[in-house]
Amino acid sequence: MSDWLFDLGNSRFKFAPLQGDRAGDVQAWAHGAEGMAGQPPHSLPSGTTAFVASVAAPSLTSAMLDQLQRRFEHVHVVRTSAECAGVRIAYAKPEKFGVDRFLALLAAAKAQRPVLVVGVGTALTIDLLDADGQHHGGRISASPTTMREALHARAVQLPATGGDYSEFANDTADALASGCDGAAVALIERSAQQAHTLLGVAPSLLVHGGGAPALMPLLPGADYHPSLVLDGLARWAVHQPAG
């Protein structure tokens, strides 16, 4: 029997076997939590223990937990805590800190160096972690995808997708892609500058999430880590008390 990790997001659902203190080979369903309903039950693994992180709607989380409880002897759901695996969360009320951000920090802390952790999903999240595991807070904004969707919802003539990044675009689709991607990059760059001032050293930049690949060409020196949340979930799992 085996232990598995499950990350239930707004736009993607990912799972992987637990291998030591990291995630093994990751499988993903592109349509996230809602797409889960169309999957046959046998497409999910079974085993001894399921470790689950979810930022999806409560009804979808409940549906997934119901399936997992039929396939695993034990099911553990992550909750953000003030401290775990050497990471100390800056929020006065840690339960208000998103579990995906929490797990990303647990994974990033393993390197024991200052790091700016950037998540690009429905939201753009930016969190600063120092080499000692102290979280210094962060920012939340709309991701480029969400910016595009919001503009399209208010002005249907503005396409929600398409276009290529250009510093000075000469058509609408490119201008939208450039503006929304550029806004995200500017916030990341501003955060990196302020982090350098605060810590006295430039942090490394660690980027994850479904929207990350589009930004990577604009972030020289950044590292892309697509399984960061699952790796953080693995660290959370191995740092839980026995039993």
Swiss-Prot record:
GO molecular function: ATP binding; pantothenate kinase activity
Pathway given in the UniProt record: Cofactor biosynthesis; coenzyme A biosynthesis; CoA from (R)-pantothenate: step 1/5
UniProtKB keywords: ATP-binding, Coenzyme A biosynthesis, Cytoplasm, Kinase, Nucleotide-binding, Potassium, Transferase
Domain of life, per lineage: Bacteria
Reactions mediated catalytically: (R)-pantothenate + ATP = (R)-4'-phosphopantothenate + ADP + H(+)
Cofactor(s) for this UniProt protein: NH4(+); K(+)
Active site positions, chain numbering: 100 (proton acceptor)
The name this protein goes by in its record: Type III pantothenate kinase
Binding site for substrate: 91, 98-101, 172
Residues given in the record as ATP binding sites: 7-14, 122
GO BP terms: coenzyme A biosynthetic process
Localisation: Cytoplasm
Complex and partners: Homodimer.
Recorded GO CC terms: cytoplasm
Cofactor notes: A monovalent cation. Ammonium or potassium.
UniProt-listed Pfam families: Pan_kinase
Stated role: Catalyzes the phosphorylation of pantothenate (Pan), the first step in CoA biosynthesis.
EC number: 2.7.1.33
Residue intervals passing through the bilayer: none
InterPro entries named among the record's database cross-references: ATPase_NBD, Type_III_PanK
Family designation: Belongs to the type III pantothenate kinase family.
